Amino acid sequence: KDSYGRYVGIITGISTDSNGKIQSVGVDAGSNGFAKFEGDRITFEEDSPELTSEWKLNSDSFLKTNGIAEKKVLALQELYEEEEITQDVFEHLTNRHKAQLDDYSVSCGDTVEILNRKVESLSLESSAADKFIGTLKLQHRIGDISDDVFCAAKDYMSTILQRNEKEIADLSTVLHDIAPQELTEAIE
């Protein structure tokens, strides 16, 4: 399962390094075919493997890297304002880290675009699920499906909607966290 409880597939094999650390996991993903996931995406919750979303792993790494760059630039600004370093040293070190911040700006735009596409995809899936639930309600109302079948299907569809809502909320939080900061503007 993924971290939202969705079934990913059946594990077909696990590759480890000489220390026993998981390097990759092979999964039969049904109609999506075979998939190989890197070991850093796999965690264990109550002895069950859980796949971390690729967007989550990438955005966490992005936020960590960006946080370090921001701290350096802010520290440089403080050192300069407190006259701990000269303007020449400030400019030299700022220029050195400016390339990293420029990369951040490009990477930030790409990351935001990827996360927005994921939100859109989940929203479309939720809309399709809502429409399907409407169809189920209609069939139930006219007697085409029994109470038991209707309740089971509706409950399962509700679970899908809850998972999507949770992931959209998580994506929105990450999007808020990686929105371009005033920091990049201050340096330019």
Indicate where each model-derived feature is located.
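Peripheral interaction segments used for macromolecular assembly
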Residues: 1-186
